[in-house]
């Protein structure tokens, strides 16, 4: 029964459209799997695994419906809209690079309005300044009005400012409120000035100085105010102390000078006049409108001036030092932020070096990464084919094989195999199959497991491109079924494995003869270890470079960093010394004068013995006790033996009293022969000797 030829794709993608070709291939494979799994209608799935509706068209060039095309166009327009909105918001709220040009232009406009507002108060330049200011105000209204509207619109790129409620929340920000107030005041001034209203020359003229608020809006992000607030908050206790003492000095100085000068000096007729004098004097302004006349008042003023000025000047020094420390801290923070990228690169390089180890074959992410960036090996196959054509006199390998060769004529060059031998992954010139590194690793590992006999019987599956030529299985015995994987991102790229092309004219005997006679020169098993070695060497070099760059960023920034490094090293050294001391105490054993023993009190005998058994000194003492016990027992045995020798008779042997062995209570060693057993054996020996004597 002849097998049905493989189904071709109805919608072939163009050669240069790789993403759409991948989409078509995935859809076709899903449909084939659905037909093979169930006998009913195929159930097609999308790229994310969600089932497609039954009436959904097959994705391909020209096959999409009008609604789908309209949806794609609307999605693209939405992306462009969001991108433009985000770009405008960054230009207005977070300017960088050339965006500062616009903000400098706005600053010049605001500064020009401020200068003209000042000149409009001078009688000589009032008319010219008012005319120029009127024109500039029109320009400012247009610019600020458009900018305010664009700011509110571009705020929609942030999630919290989307929708009407989000826009209203953005409009309630302090700087937006200032912009709105200045805009309304400018419109009111221009409207009243153009109508020639007399009221505009009196009441609305003062509204022009609301333009001073425009200078506040120059710092949209409030960096200066945040810096000042952080410095004041960091040194709040010192500032409160200095201000409190200065205020007390001001009150006492003003009151005492008022008591001394109120009768003799009309300038100090009230306590308020004295407070004014004290404020001007202690702040070192010194207008000179009020001065003490009496000697008592002058002495008090001099004493309190020397004491109070120092406290009034303290906040300036505190704020100055705080600003200096804050700037230094910001520089240090920037220096530390420069370490993030080298540290991340070092971690990534270390992990990739770890994952490329040959003993960790289960880590495949790094191999997938290099599989996506490795160059195509199709040029290598073309180079082999070009060399063979040059050796064959300009003919292709198939033409050389089909050309008749006279009998007995020697061949100039050895023939080159052009067909794929089953069971071997080899490079043969022909049609290339697009196969990734992970598939080649899987095939090579399966070949090593199955062995040469099984490899010869069952050729490894080689995935082929759907857009390539499909040859029927009836005409091509070496046809290999398609093997697709949804995670295979490299199936449309040339690879190391090249598929041969065998014509139908060749017989089976010729194929077998060629398989037995010739072998391909380059195999995947030969190339893949070399590629892995090269990749691992590259990972080692990248790891060393990342390590060197990270060490360069660890250089100390200033003296404070050096002190911190020394203190950290000192703490580390103390910890190591403490650990070493604990180990020495454990080896030698803790004596009676140990500090912990004195602090926690005396331990029980069981605890002391347990501690002694752990320490080396306790073990040495235990061995010494056992040796003493053995020596004592040996002395007793030698004494018993010497008495037996001196008596010389068996009767004396029975009369000799065997000394009892006192077991050493302090020793853990006990002899397997007890002293009772020794006495019993001695009595048995004496009885046996007496019996033998009587028999004689």
Curated annotation (Swiss-Prot):
Entry's localization field: Basal cell membrane
Q: Which residues lie on this side of the membrane: Cytoplasmic?
A: 1-97, 154-169, 225-236, 324-696
Q: What catalytic activity is recorded?
A: K(+)(in) = K(+)(out)
Record-level Gene Ontology MF annotations: voltage-gated potassium channel activity
Return the Gene3D superfamilies for the record: 1.10.287.70, 6.10.140.1910
Compositional bias of kind Polar residues: 465-484
Q: Where is the composition biased (Basic and acidic residues)?
A: 592-606
Activity modulation comment? Two molecules of phosphatidylinositol-4,5-bisphosphate (PIP2-I and PIP2-II) are essential to activate KCNQ4 channel by inducing the coupling of the voltage-sensing domain (VSD) and the pore-forming domain (PD). Upon channel activation, PIP2-I and PIP2-II disrupt the VSD-calmodulin/CALM interaction, causing the release of CALM from the VSD which triggers the opening of the gate. Calcium suppresses KCNQ4 channel current through calcium-bound CALM C-terminus. Therefore CALM acts as calcium sensor that controls channel activity.
Name of a matching Pfam family: KCNQ_channel
Q: Which portions of the sequence form the region Interaction with CALM?
A: 343-352, 536-550
TM ranges are 98-119, 131-153, 170-192, 204-224, 237-259, 295-323
Chain residues that bind a 1,2-diacyl-sn-glycero-3-phospho-(1D-myo-inositol-4,5-bisphosphate) 2: 221, 236, 331, 334
Q: Per the entry's comment, what about the domains? A: Each channel subunit contains six transmembrane segments (S1-S6) with S1-S4 forming one voltage sensing domain (VSD) and S5-S6 contributing to form one quarter of an interlocking pore-forming domain (PD).
Q: Its quaternary structure? A: Homotetramer. Interacts (via C-terminus) with calmodulin; forms a heterooctameric structure (with 4:4 KCNQ1:CALM stoichiometry); the interaction is calcium-independent, constitutive, participates in the proper assembly of a functional channel. The interaction with calcium-free CALM controls channel trafficking whereas interaction with calcium-bound CALM regulates channel gating. May form a functional heteromultimeric channel with KCNQ3. Interacts with HSP90AB1; promotes cell surface expression of KCNQ4.
Q: What is this protein called?
A: Potassium voltage-gated channel subfamily KQT member 4
Q: Organism source for this protein?
A: Mus musculus
